[in-house]
Swiss-Prot record:
Keywords noted in UniProt: Cell cycle, Cell division
GO biological process, any: division septum site selection
Gene that produces this protein: minE
Gene3D superfamilies: Cell division topological specificity factor MinE
Name under which the protein is recorded: Cell division topological specificity factor
Chain ranges passing through the membrane: none
Family (UniProt): Belongs to the MinE family.
Function as written in the Swiss-Prot or TrEMBL entry: Prevents the cell division inhibition by proteins MinC and MinD at internal division sites while permitting inhibition at polar sites. This ensures cell division at the proper site by restricting the formation of a division septum at the midpoint of the long axis of the cell.
Domain of life: Bacteria
GO CC annotation terms, alphabetical: plasma membrane
InterPro entries recorded: MinE, MinE_sf
């Protein structure tokens, strides 16, 4: 290592920048004690659209819940009641 390389700042990779930003977002969410992420309604709608491609389903048949279990554990639970196949 030359003396110039020692004083020249290291160029950050995009992965390290993305990781750093993600850590900031996660820390901010934890500090806000947000009970559920803001994207849950859109997530439920997207899941409902995908299921509707294959099965006729009512929106009330899909339940999505989010729970905090401790400081570093979050649980996303998805319950889908599928209709009975009529033959």
């Amino acid at each position: 290592m030359s003396l110039l390389e020692f004083f020249r700042p290291q160029k950050k990779t995009s992965a390290s920048v993305a990781k750093e930003r993600l850590q900031i977002i996660v820390a901010e969410r934890r500090s806000q004690n947000d009970p559920a992420p803001s994207y849950l309604p859109q997530l439920k709608e997207d899941i409902l659209k995908v299921i509707a491609k294959y099965v006729a389903i009512d929106p009330s048949m899909v339940e999505l819940s989010f729970e905090h279990k401790g400081d570093d554990i979050s649980v996303l639970e998805l319950n889908v009641k599928l209709p009975d196949d009529e033959k």
